[in-house]
Amino acid sequence: MYAVFQSGGKQHRVSEGQVVRLEKLELATGATVEFDSVLMVVNGEDVKIGAPVVAGAKVVAEVIAQGRGEKVKIVKFRRRKHSRKQQGHRQWFTEVKITGIQA
């Protein structure tokens, strides 16, 4: 059984017991979160596709950790001008473990 849900402007395909990195959620470690915007649920041959969401379906998860991702370097280089600009960025994330899928 797996489901596709939306969080932070992105879609995630998850199954029970899976650990997923999402965009930062303002929740404490150990908290439980429910995602109601489930786009699709598949249970064997039974496929439920939402228009746009599956009615009554939800994905339940537990917050494992908060953190920051790997550094991404942004470089702007101006040729022949002896000029360059560097910038770094580390995106905040929330790591959750999927504890249940209800359809």
Swiss-Prot record:
Please provide the Gene Ontology terms (biological process) for this protein.
translation
- PROSITE patterns xrefs: RIBOSOMAL_L21
Q: Lineage of the native species? A: Bacteria, Pseudomonadati, Pseudomonadota, Gammaproteobacteria, Pasteurellales
Question: Can you name one GO molecular function term for this protein?
Answer: rRNA binding
InterPro entries assigned to the protein according to its UniProt record, in alphabetical order? bL21-like (IPR028909), bL21-like_sf (IPR036164), Ribosomal_bL21 (IPR001787), Ribosomal_bL21_CS (IPR018258)
- What keywords is this UniProt entry annotated with? Ribonucleoprotein, Ribosomal protein, RNA-binding, rRNA-binding
Q: What does this protein do?
A: This protein binds to 23S rRNA in the presence of protein L20.
Q: What is this protein identified as?
A: Large ribosomal subunit protein bL21
SUPFAM superfamilies linked to this entry: L21p-like
> What species does this protein belong to?
Haemophilus influenzae (strain 86-028NP)
Which family does the entry's similarity section mention?
Answer: Belongs to the bacterial ribosomal protein bL21 family.
- Give the multimer and partner information: Part of the 50S ribosomal subunit. Contacts protein L20.
Q: Does the keyword Isomerase apply?
A: no
Supply the HAMAP family for this chain: Ribosomal_bL21 (MF_01363)
Q: Might you report a single GO cellular component term?
A: cytoplasm
